[in-house]
Amino acid sequence: MGESSFTVLRDIGSLPLTENEEIRFSIDVYRGFRYVSVRRYLQTDGFAGPTRDGLTLTVEIIRVLEPKIAALPDDPKSVEDGQLGKFAKRQGSCVVVAIGSFKGKRGLALRQWQDECGWTKKGIWLPLEHLKEIKALFRQTREALDEQPTDDF
């Protein structure tokens, strides 16, 4: 495998949103580093594949974020709006995770922040109505990361 190649190591699962739209969680490797990809996928007559909606999370972010998401109440109506945390991704960049509303629906927003320019276009919004599935996907991702890697990357 080349030094700069991108490889999906493991598909964790998906969160179906509509008949032709889903959010997929996967563990990937790029330039020798493992990370988690949370990305929206579409399947239409003219296009099938990943969209630009999504972001990558480091292994360390998942290990800290998953317990915070697991601790949220099971009933989405009892989850309070607010920031769950701000997690360093690399120097000058972090991921901000918050509960909020968008277009009349509540969700879990994961957005990237750059110190020099503010919010970037990288991010994903997970509908809170799927909180049970969201918790399970983050737990399964953390468990998969805790397993010993079988691939040399």
Language model regions located:
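Positively charged, low-complexity terminal tracts
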Residues: 1-153
